């Protein structure tokens, strides 16, 4: 049903071969960075809001997001003539904040992290009676995200493995459920930023837990607390979860730009980072990396490119203390050359 409903708004994004990206691996990219609003999030948000009653629609919807879910909710609500309010952490990329406003939502910036924005959204929901559209821990949202899994099976029927970014777990829950229901032998791998490994910890420790902090430039997956529903689904349907460092994410973003001419945000590049740096057993497997979004702030992108160049050995930063006397710059150039 979600697949039918989403035909009205979501694109069936391309699945492209990435032969140059990771030599020796049969790699494909599911380009949700080219989705409406630049992210997969519109799928879950639109499907959830489309199922609201007339009474719920009249009261409006409220959400919390670091950016991509915000844009999905704003677009869906505006398309259906419904009022939307979105609480966003004050550190959210300006591009995502402004885009959310342009799409018709009222934005409230909340000091702190995503979790602080979530608490504020719940508070407002209790005060106003608006329907809270959870970014990941909701069965209808998960069903919307799961349509990506159906598309992957349609586009690459003999797929062996799919690598998916994880923040709160909504995307991988939907994709894993959809694929495993039809092709249980397909491996589903999750990837988190090493600085925000909430689901990775929960998965390997077999218990639901909250991190003290979630620090990563991949703002789309900087989540301290995974969803309860998503944790249960991940535990049941996901084969393994790994983490990647900030440098590895930066290198993956750069590799996608140079080799595939694709712009991915930090979260969206994590599956490619896992493939590039040998985090998973992919030899001999037709593997799909799900590029979840491409909404990266240009200032962050500039720093990421520099970081990626350093990571790949093509740029070096030097700090040299010199005496204040003639001939020092000549000495430095002689040493460097």
Give the positions of each predicted feature.
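PLP-dependent amino-acid enzyme catalytic core
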Residues: 1-337
């Amino acid at each position: 049903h979600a697949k039918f409903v989403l035909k009205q708004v979501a694109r069936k994004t391309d699945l492209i071969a990435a032969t140059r990206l990771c030599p020796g691996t049969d790699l494909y990219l599911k380009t949700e960075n080219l989705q409406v609003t630049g992210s997969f999030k519109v799928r879950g948000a639109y499907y959830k809001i489309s199922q609201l009653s007339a009474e719920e629609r009249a009261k409006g919807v409220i959400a919390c997001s670091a950016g991509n879910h915000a844009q999905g909710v704003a677009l869906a609500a505006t398309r259906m003539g419904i009022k939307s309010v979105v609480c966003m952490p004050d550190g959210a990329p300006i591009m995502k904040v402004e885009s959310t406003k342009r799409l018709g939502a009222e934005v409230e910036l909340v000091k702190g992290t995503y979790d602080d924005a979530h608490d504020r959204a719940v508070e407002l929901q209790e005060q106003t009676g608006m329907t809270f559209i959870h970014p990941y821990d909701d069965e209808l949202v998960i069903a919307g995200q799961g349509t990506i899994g159906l598309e992957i099976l349609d586009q690459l029927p003999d797929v062996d493995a799919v690598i998916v970014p994880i923040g709160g777990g909504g995307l991988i829950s939907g994709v894993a459920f959809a694929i495993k229901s039809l092709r249980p032998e397909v491996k589903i791998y999750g990837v988190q930023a090493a600085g925000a490994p909430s689901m990775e910890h929960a998965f390997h420790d077999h218990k639901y837990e909250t991190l003290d902090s979630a620090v990563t430039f991949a703002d789309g997956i900087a989540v301290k607390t995974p969803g309860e529903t998503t944790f249960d689904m991940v535990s049941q349907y996901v084969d393994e979860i790994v983490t990647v460092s900030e440098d590895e994410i930066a290198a993956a973003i750069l590799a996608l730009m140079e080799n595939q001419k694709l712009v991915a945000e930090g979260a969206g590049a994590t599956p490619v980072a896992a493939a590039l740096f040998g985090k998973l057993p992919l030899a001999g497997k037709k593997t799909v990396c799900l590029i979840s979004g491409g909404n990266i702030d240009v200032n962050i992108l500039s720093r990421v490119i520099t970081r990626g160049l350093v990571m790949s050995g093509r740029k070096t930063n030097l700090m040299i203390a010199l005496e204040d006397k003639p001939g020092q710059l000549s000495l430095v150039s002689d040493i460097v050359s």
